[in-house]
Each structure stands twice: as structure tokens, then as C-alpha cells.
């Protein structure tokens, strides 16, 4: 596994939009605030053009998204790349992505949600570690939440021991100034299949909604990844955006039968963003209806995802 070089003061952090770009006025405010926050920390920021454009849920055409990502990959001054936003259609740019150039120029890539399509593929196909974390605009909030602090510590090579947060934001809130912090809506309460759990493994995962689009395509390299790293054990971290119980059950079954979980040592599930069930299944019941036969530890409601 290749771990890109950690960033240091005066390095350039690149920002590009392989999914959607920014379109609201408050998002443009957040872009400026996030750039200022990272500059105060000692970094330069370089934005590609599509960070500030959005049409029909896309920052630009698929070939253009591939080109703008590549411009940062090949830029020797850029040492890390933070993706601008999530969305729905990142998968369109995967055929336009030069994965060989990414292999030759390993850099930290980070994002979440629809960004899973790029991050997961880079890790499983190129053997390059990626970060499932903040999109760029999240660095605009004042003061930073520990999420942003942990993120920067990791990029800088200071490996934090991440602990459960006290509260989490349970809804979407409109932003006015762009500096708004997370709302402390509910207390965090992790749950597990056992009272005390200790799991060790190589972490892999992302947004289930997106992973289900990758399975069985030419970008699905998980079986080979399992062969290379199976001896370490794969600790899967998974979260869903708007899968109901029926889609969740079918999706996990599909991944299991496709061999994705052949080297699994356990699972960490984030809190689902939007979830319902036609049959009255809780999220945990839906998950365990598929995974219980694996007899592996599972953690629910972790601080992962939307």
C-alpha cells in the first residue's frame, strides 16, 4: 500500500470537482473562508475551474472533470487534493480518469459521499491510501470541529486517535454566513454486536449507494485487493445516504456474493442519512439479516458519513 507524502507548510492543496461543483452564493463564501483558513495554517490553495461551476448536478463534462483532476495530479507543487463536493454523477468521469498517471504521482485524495467512486477505485486499483473525510467547504466553519482538526492532523502526518464525538448533527441546515458550525442535535451512541469489541484490520469502504454502482464493472478490483491484503484482514466502514431497508439488504447481499467481504474481519456502519423500511426493519436489523451469517463483529452509529 502506498501512503502519499504528508503535507508540510507552504505546500499547495489542490481542489477539484469530479462530481458536482458549487452554485449557491453561500457556497462561494465558504470557498473563500476555507481557503483563508488553510492559508492561515500555512498552506497555499489551488482551485480548478470546475469548482465554481454546476449544471444539472455536474461541475463540468466527464472528460473535463478527468482533465482538471489530472492537472492537479501532474502538478509537482500540489501534495494533496481535496474534492469540492459530493453529488450523484461522479461515476461518469471514471472512464476519463488516467489511473496510470495517478499511480505514478501518488497524492492524498479526500472527500466523502459521491467522492467514494474515485477514492475507493484509487485505493483498490492503484494501491494508494485515500481519506474518507471533509470536502473543501467544511474547512470554512469557525471554529473548526474536531473533524477538521483530525483531518489536518492526518494530512500532516500526525496520526490522531479518533474518539467518538459527543454530539452529531441530525438534519440539513441552511447556511447564511458560511461559518456555521455543526449543530449538536443528538448525543452520539455507538452500538455493537457485542458489549466490548476490538477489531484490527485494513480499513476500506465508503458510501454504499456509490459502491453498489461499482460492483461488477471494470472499476471493481476488490477480489484482487482481497488477495493482496487479505492477510491483514479488511475492516469495512460503510454508510448510506438514501437506501431504504430493501435496497440495503439487496445491496449488502450483492457485495457479499460478489466476494467483497471474503477477507472481512468486521464492519463499522455510520448513521444512515435517510432511511425507511416498508417492512418495519430497523437499520441494524436490515444489516444483520445479511451479515449475521459471517459471524463477524459489527459496530453501528459510528461517526462516519453524512
Give the location of each predicted region:
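ATP/NTP phosphate-donor binding region
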Residues: 1-77
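Long, hydrophobic/aromatic-enriched structural stretches that serve as scaffold segments
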Residues: 74-97
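Short, acidic/small-residue loops that bind anionic groups at enzyme active sites
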Residues: 97-123, 129-137, 293-298
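Conserved anion/nucleotide-ligand pocket segment
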Residues: 131-209
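Oxyanion-binding "anion nests"
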Residues: 202-248
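C-terminal active-site/capping subdomain that shapes the small-molecule cofactor and substrate pocket
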Residues: 244-306
Amino acid at each position: 500500500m502506498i501512503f502519499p507524502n504528508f503535507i508540510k507548510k507552504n505546500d499547495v492543496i489542490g481542489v477539484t470537482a469530479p462530481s458536482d461543483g458549487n452554485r449557491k452564493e453561500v457556497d462561494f463564501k465558504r470557498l473563500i473562508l476555507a481557503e483563508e483558513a488553510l492559508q492561515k495554517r500555512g498552506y497555499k490553495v489551488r482551485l480548478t475551474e470546475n469548482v465554481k461551476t454546476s449544471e444539472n448536478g455536474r461541475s463540468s463534462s466527464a472528460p473535463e472533470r478527468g482533465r482538471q483532476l489530472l492537472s492537479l495530479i501532474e502538478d509537482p507543487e500540489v501534495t494533496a487534493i481535496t474534492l469540492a463536493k459530493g453529488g450523484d454523477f461522479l461515476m461518469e468521469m471514471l472512464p476519463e480518469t488516467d489511473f496510470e498517471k495517478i499511480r505514478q504521482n501518488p497524492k492524498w485524495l479526500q472527500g466523502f459521499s459521491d467522492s467514494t467512486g474515485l477514492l475507493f477505485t484509487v485505493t483498490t486499483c492503484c494501491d494508494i491510501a485515500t481519506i474518507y473525510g471533509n470536502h473543501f467547504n467544511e474547512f470554512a466553519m469557525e471554529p473548526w470541529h474536531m473533524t477538521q482538526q483530525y483531518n489536518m492532523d492526518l494530512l500532516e502526518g500526525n496520526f490522531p486517535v479518533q474518539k467518538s464525538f459527543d454530539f452529531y448533527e441530525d438534519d440539513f441546515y441552511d447556511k447564511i454566513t458560511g461559518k456555521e458550525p455543526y449543530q449538536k442535535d443528538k448525543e452520539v451512541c455507538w452500538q455493537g454486536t457485542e458489549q466490548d469489541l476490538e477489531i484490527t484490520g485494513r480499513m476500506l469502504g465508503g458510501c454504499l449507494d456509490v459502491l453498489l454502482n461499482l460492483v461488477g464493472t471494470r472499476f471493481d478490483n476488490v477480489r484482487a485487493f482481497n488477495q493482496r491484503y487479505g492477510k491483514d484482514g479488511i475492516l469495512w466502514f460503510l454508510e448510506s445516504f438514501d437506501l431504504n431497508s430493501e435496497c440495503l439488504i439487496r445491496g449488502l447481499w450483492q457485495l457479499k456474493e460478489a466476494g467483497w467481504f471474503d477477507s472481512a474481519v468486521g464492519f463499522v456502519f455510520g448513521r444512515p442519512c435517510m432511511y425507511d423500511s416498508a417492512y418495519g426493519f430497523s437499520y441494524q436489523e436490515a444489516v444483520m439479516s445479511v451479515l449475521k451469517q459471517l459471524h463477524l463483529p459489527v459496530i453501528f452509529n459510528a461517526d462516519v458519513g453524512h
